[in-house]
């Protein structure tokens, strides 16, 4: 296979190397002694190179998985023998139209590099997942990501104006004009969250915004989780647009702050001073019953918001027979408090568990759980980790919650995909069969082929 690819692209773009994402179950397996094998990786220099590789793979029946920054936590690139990884890192060019606020970025563009380039021009993408320093534009799109300022800027699907995609047979579908169109459905949206199952995103057309003229953040605390969730719901249902709004449960509050008691809420407003000031006054009324903590919690959050880096995640999982993971789910406001109690009970039965709430909309928000523990042996730790996931996924089913908000599906959520999607899984299968009849694209996308 390597020889065929070298004949196709030359020797330089084809390498063998160890490739891992940040899926805790995969890292735990390696720690327990699972054999690590180098992957065959091809790194085309341009879109035509991607097209040639996929044409060849379709002809030869070789499985291909796109590779971005490797910051995924759900095992979407946990390949098996005989597969090919297609590294998109060479597609790293981008162009910023400061008049129309339109960005064209290759799939391999680093998220933080793009954001800093926009900031230099007084602009922002407004998309700040915690993986931003490592993640690529293509990966953010493929996993249907959401950022820390999503209540203000929207999720990745709200920022994508168009996509250029290479289909499994090598056809290049170029992005349409960025203006909204009613000439057929927005078919590029099929690829947002597809985890590389339908083809490979090679370029994105994205909506930028001007940096806000003013940002003002602070912290308050509530005696109960219910009171904090009620305040978040009131903020969103009054049509305010907070830049950031994050509520921590009692255990996570104790972890985040030595000053706050109860449940900490970090909230910020942004925009033109007159607009942000008006929103701040409405926030004052809604949060009047909470304990006021000033700007310190906001500043602390800003300083540490990207602290769970890829290397830190790996270091935390070095301890023998330990586990650490995150599960992000989402539900409507009426279900969130009961969902939280149910998931926490399942996770805490195996170890320690924390939760914060963010990505709020008028209908509900994301509940983001972090859990950790240890066991006498590696196998016992793996079993405890699996039980924790099962408990969380079953709780979502009981409370009408979605099992994944912004990390994607991959291998981690494979056992629960059919229950989550219902009849829509048949729609997925039909589209997949039409676009990829040879079935060469990422076999772990959306939990794997069925």
What are the language-model segments listed below?
Residues 1-55, 72-101, 250-256, 299-324, ...:
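N-terminal flexible segment immediately upstream of the FAD-binding catalytic core
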Residues 17-29, 210, 216, 221, ...:
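C-terminal substrate-recognition/cap domain of FAD-linked oxidoreductases
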Residues 68-71, 91, 130, 247-250, ...:
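Short, ordered loop/turn segments at secondary-structure junctions
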Residues 92-246:
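FAD-binding subdomain of flavoenzyme oxidoreductases
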Residues 410-450:
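Activity-critical C-terminal alpha-helical subdomain
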